[in-house]
Amino acid sequence: MFRRAIINKDTQVCMSLAARPSNFGTRFHNYLYEALDLNYLYKAFSPTDLTQAISGVRGLGIRGCAISMPFKEACIPLVDELDASAQAIHSVNTIVNTNGHLKAYNTDYIAIARLLANYKVSPDLVFALRGSGGMAKAVACALKDAGFTRGYIVAIDEASGKQLAELYGYEWRPDTDGIEADLLINATPIGMAGGNDADKLSYSEQEVDKASVIFDVVALPPVTPLIRYARERGKTVITGSEVFAIQAVEQFVLYTGIRPDDALFQKAAAWSRL
């Protein structure tokens, strides 16, 4: 699918900021712009200076900006207003620019909560959540709201790990030694394409073998080493590409005010994964 419309002075520009951008968001949003005949354009960037990049969003009239690892917390002081979701989680993945006023949201939470419900993941399961950054905060909040009462925040950084665990009434651990969990969640860059840990599992094979549900929020590649191994073992898997698609359509709604029907959403998500 190729963009037929000619870019002109009235074209609304949306963008993303990530340390390691993928083509998923670019293909997803531009597919929907084309399908709905909207005068919008989406482009991914990898900023060398976050403060200047956010200033550019404001100064150039960029309509919307997606925020990915590792900028989800660092951009908070750079915006004018936090939506209730971003304020509660203290993590941002979306910025909407309305006449120079930058308001930040967190649509990661929506995606995670929806997927836990769609896959009927029982809140009775004991979980292990690896990570304590912006995405981990959204996951922990969604788990708490879904009724999960027993779980571990596994984070090397003791300060942020303990803070996140205490906020939601969970237990912090520096590693997974001695943990037996039915639900394993990775909210770190382990397994992400282009990184030093791209080929690594975020949990050991033995830990995956003992679990029943595996949830990896890493979207690139669509099948991470963790997801591949879990599928081979017949586990229920929830992928980062599913998270990405749901949070992206919620961003699309914030940017354009239009909600695509489910059939169009599925087509855009499928196109994005090619």
Per-region residue spans from a language model:
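Glycine-rich adenosine-cofactor-binding loop
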Residues: 104-106, 120-148, 155
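Short glycine-rich anion-binding loops that position phosphate/pyrophosphate groups of nucleotides
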Residues: 63, 67-76, 134-135, 189-192, ...
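NAD(P)-binding Rossmann-fold cofactor-contacting core
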Residues: 146-168
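Phosphate/diphosphate ligand-binding glycine-rich loop within oxidoreductases
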Residues: 2-119
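Adenosine-phosphate binding glycine-rich loop
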Residues: 217-274
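Rossmann-like adenosine-cofactor binding region
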Residues: 168-237
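Short, conserved loop/helix-junction motifs that constitute active-site signature segments
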Residues: 5-8, 121-123, 145-147, 202-211
